[in-house]
A protein has these predicted regions:
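Short hydrophobic alpha-helical segments enriched in small aliphatic residues
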Residues: 4-6
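The two-metal-ion catalytic cores of nucleic-acid processing enzymes
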Residues: 1
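Short intrinsically disordered, low-complexity segments
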Residues: 10-14, 37-40
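Bacterial N-terminal signal peptides that target proteins for export
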Residues: 11-26
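Bacterial N-terminal signal peptides
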Residues: 24-35
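Beta-propeller-forming repeat regions
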Residues: 40-298
Length: 298
């Protein structure tokens, strides 16, 4: 295969790097998006955290968002030192409920993710929670007896001002139960981890070192995409490696996280990565202003 230079904006962008010639393409497969897509501002949302997004749900929870801006952490990894103090959910009956954190932690995130993690037909709420002394953890909340309650949480990273960024939610190992993919410390040699909710706890399912799905200070968190890269019926994860000058396709098939392929980029990945409506094309904005369009090979 060889590189072919094309203009920006074409359906398939192939570019000439410094070294060898290789075509960048994605094998078409099933693409799983998050169960609730982001909305700029869901109808009826109040107390929305600045520069954050509400998400819509199709079940009992019709919308979820972060609010009650607080300044007690001061990390500023997402562009300012304002974080969320309360997690909100609006229900089908129009009622809005919330879970307010105590003074020892914040929601260091810009969007809530909705997904049914345990197969009970009801979405859980997935968000990054940061402790003022111990850094970040992935937290799962759920609707219990009409209230938002904490269900499970990964261990704190253990050091103040250490953060993690979610990368995807899908059944990455093919066992019929979704995993949550995160990159732990994406700015200092990130580790990709897969977690699954089981028995009321988040259980580690695999990890692989060497990824970065965020640029420090950026509000763009969506630097990943989920798709079936190797056409084996099990979805994989596409995300940048450390330095964000290449993309990796990681599989959890077989129970072990491993890299299937790497795709060099002509500049650092900026994001957000987006999929077309059919899940056939991934658009990858770069820091130099170019847009790399990655499509299935025909």
């Amino acid at each position: 295969m060889e590189y072919v230079d094309t203009k920006k904006g074409t359906n398939l962008l192939m570019f000439r790097p410094i070294r060898d010639f290789v075509r960048i393409c994605l094998f078409f497969g099933l693409v799983l998006a998050l169960p609730a897509g982001p909305a700029a501002a869901a109808e009826g949302v109040q107390d929305l955290l600045p520069d954050s997004r509400a998400v819509r749900g199709s079940g009992l929870i019709t919308a979820a968002w972060l609010g009650q801006p607080v300044r007690r952490y001061g990390h500023g990894v997402l562009g300012d030192r304002i974080e969320g103090g309360t997690l909100y959910a609006r229900l089908t009956n129009g009622r809005t409920i919330g879970h307010r954190l105590d003074s020892r932690s914040v929601f260091e995130d810009l969007t809530v993710r909705l997904a049914d993690l345990n197969g009970n037909g009801q979405d859980e709420l997935i968000v990054v929670q940061s402790n003022l002394e111990k850094g970040s953890a992935l937290a799962v909340f759920g609707l219990r007896a009409g209230r938002l309650q904490a269900i499970a949480r990964t261990p704190w990273i253990g050091t103040r001002n250490r953060w993690l960024n979610p990368a995807g939610i899908a059944d990455y190992n093919g066992d019929g139960v979704p995993e949550i993919a995160i990159v732990r410390t994406p700015h200092i040699g990130g580790t990709l981890q897969f977690w699954q909710l089981a028995g009321g706890e988040l259980v580690a399912k695999g990890e692989q070192y060497g990824f970065s799905n965020h640029r420090i200070g950026s509000r763009i968190q969506d630097l990943s995409a989920t798709l079936d890269w190797d056409s084996n019926g099990i979805v994989d994860l596409l995300l940048p490696e450390v330095g964000r000058r290449s993309l990796a396709i990681v599989t959890l098939s077989g129970g072990t996280a491993r890299v299937l392929a790497t795709l060099p980029m002509p500049a650092e990945v900026r994001g957000p990565l987006t999929l077309d409506a059919g899940g056939r094309t991934v658009r990858v904005p770069l820091e130099n202003g170019e847009m790399v369009t990655v499509s299935p090979e025909r």
